[in-house]
Curated annotation (Swiss-Prot):
Protein name as annotated: Glucose-6-phosphate 1-dehydrogenase
Protein's organism: Cricetulus griseus
Binding annotation for NADP(+) 1: 38-45, 72, 147, 171
Gene name as annotated: G6PD
Active-site residues, record numbering mapped to chain: 263
Pfam families, per the entry: G6PD_C (PF02781), G6PD_N (PF00479)
Length: 515
């Protein structure tokens, strides 16, 4: 293997800048104003301000970029700095750059439903570029309850008259098909689809984006990526921690709305879709919509719901169950774990189960796509062979590996499980790539919508899950208890086995570069 040359962060950012500035859509010379609606909130201080700082620090933003915070709270830039800077991870050497960054920040206080407040915000932004061409990006870091008032006032009062306007909308995009359609219809009445960026940060993950290249740039996968060779597909999202005092928000939505209906379903689309005509945003999203249209509504017989309980042998938070969280309503039946089986009813995938599973307070932090292949026909090894699997590990330790059988060293033909290792982190050692939020915000600056959710995608996703969600909301079935730190309810394993997944439990991936 050729020796890998480690790139410094400066070199990597230089390559990224070159890629960005060569693109037609990245208007480096223009003034850009990035407006954070809800600047006083948790999302803004923990994610958005740090992300904009990292992009500014690494020279990835257009040079003449201003950041404007807007919220109801009477704050100053110094207040915003005190709240958000602990999440910046800035080094002492970066202090001068940090001062430059905050010199480009300003803050405007105002109500979300008051037209006069937006006139004041617009006057403030106009003063920043004094009549020159300026583009405006509005990030709605707000609860959906105020979306309608905020978007209406932005459209009527705060749109740039000399450049483009783009609006970033955070999930949840509604609670069901009806509320999502209502929100989509409202926003679509104010903005064109090419101005709307519905952000699902999982679509910014490197390995999620890598799915398309793996599938369509490698000849070896094309002939086997179908129902004749693949027995089942498992899409997993596991967190090792519970709600930890933040259960009030989670209880309103639950694990299906929070993770399954968006993150996991988007990954399913990338696994199942046909090759798009090009990598243009709409070509890719057209193929994803075709997949969603082939999926029927989830059947309750193919769903397992769970809720974690305290581990009597655990320590700290692990001793607390979901209902022990003081912010969770007493007796709540909200699921913190869900497994569901979907079927893509088309020629390529007919009969192949797509198993979606996600949960909190589980045994590990992991997000992955696992394709389990069918048994080898004509077994000559006396049932010693396990099924091949292709695993795309999204987090942690980004990796792609194939579980396969090889001969065990010795005199006899004894097969054993091994892996063909394509560990991403080792191949690109020391390469610091933008994280999901950095990548997606750069996409908005560039006008690329490939990794954002289109209105028809959203509609189909809610169509699939809304009947199940309504049934759960109305009947409030008792979720199956599972112990904090476990693999989840055993009933989920039984469901997976019933639809065709074979869990051997004899193999664990080991990063060979850390041995």
């Amino acid at each position: 293997m050729a020796e890998q040359v480690a790139l410094s962060r400066t070199q990597v950012c230089g390559i990224l800048r070159e890629e960005l500035y060569q693109g037609d859509a990245f208007h480096q010379a223009d003034t850009h104003i990035f407006i954070i609606m809800g600047a006083s909130g948790d999302l803004a201080k923990k994610k958005i301000y740090p992300t904009i700082w990292w992009l500014f620090r690494d020279g990835l933003l257009p040079e003449d970029t201003f950041i404007v915070g807007y919220a109801r709270s009477r704050l100053t830039v110094d207040d915003i700095r005190k709240q958000s800077e602990p999440f910046f991870k800035a080094t002492p050497e970066e202090r001068p750059k940090l001062e430059e960054f905050f010199a480009r920040n300003s803050y405007v206080a105002g109500q979300y439903d008051d037209p006069a407040s937006y006139k004041h915000l617009n006057s403030h932004m106009n003063a920043l570029h004094q009549g020159m061409q300026a583009n405006r990006l509005f990030y709605l870091a707000l609860p959906p309850t105020v979306y309608e008032a905020v978007t209406k006032n932005i459209q009527e009062t705060c749109m740039s008259q000399t450049g483009w306007n783009r609006i970033i909308v955070e999930k949840p995009f509604g609670r069901d098909l009806q509320s999502s359609n209502q929100l989509s219809n409202h926003i679509s009445s104010l903005f064109r689809e090419d101005q709307i960026y519905r952000i699902d940060h999982y679509l910014g993950k490197e390995m999620v984006q890598n799915l398309m290249v793996l599938r369509f740039a490698n000849r070896i996968f094309g002939p086997i990526w179908n129902r004749d060779n693949i027995a089942c597909v498992i899409l997993t999202f596991k967190e090792p921690f519970g709600t930890e005092g933040r259960g009030g928000y989670f209880d309103e939505f639950g694990i299906i709305r929070d993770v399954m209906q968006n993150h996991l379903l988007q990954m399913l689309c990338l696994v199942a879709m046909e090759k798009p005509a090009s990598t243009d945003s709409d070509d890719v999203r057209d193929e994803k919509v075709k997949v969603l249209k082939c999926i029927s509504e989830v059947e309750t017989s193919n769903v397992v719901l769970g809720q974690y309980v305290g581990n009597p042998n655990g320590e700290g938070e692990a001793t607390n169950g979901y209902l022990d969280d003081p912010t969770v309503p007493r007796g709540s039946t909200t699921a913190t774990f869900a497994a569901a089986v979907l079927y893509v009813e088309n020629e390529r995938w007919d009969g192949v189960p797509f198993i979606l599973r996600c949960g909190k307070a589980l045994n590990e932090r992991k997000a992955e796509v696992r394709l389990q292949f069918r048994d080898v026909a004509g077994d000559i090894f006396h049932q010693q062979c396990k099924r091949n699997e292709l695993v795309i590990r999204v987090q942690p330790n980004e990796a792609v590996y194939t579980k396969m059988m090889t001969k065990k060293p010795g005199m006899f033909f004894n097969p054993e499980e091994s892996e063909l290792d394509l560990t991403y982190g080792n191949r690109y050692k020391n390469v610091k790539l933008p994280d999901a939020y950095e990548r997606l915000i750069l996409d908005v600056f560039c006008g690329s919508q490939m990794h954002f959710v289109r209105s028809d995608e959203l509609r189909e996703a809610w169509r699939i899950f809304t009947p199940l969600l309504h049934k759960i909301d109305q009947e409030k079935p008792q979720p199956i208890p599972y112990v904090y730190g476990s693999r989840g309810p055993t009933e989920a394993d039984e469901l997976m086995k019933r639809v065709g997944f074979q869990y051997e439990g004899t193999y664990k991936w080991v990063n060979p570069h850390k041995l």
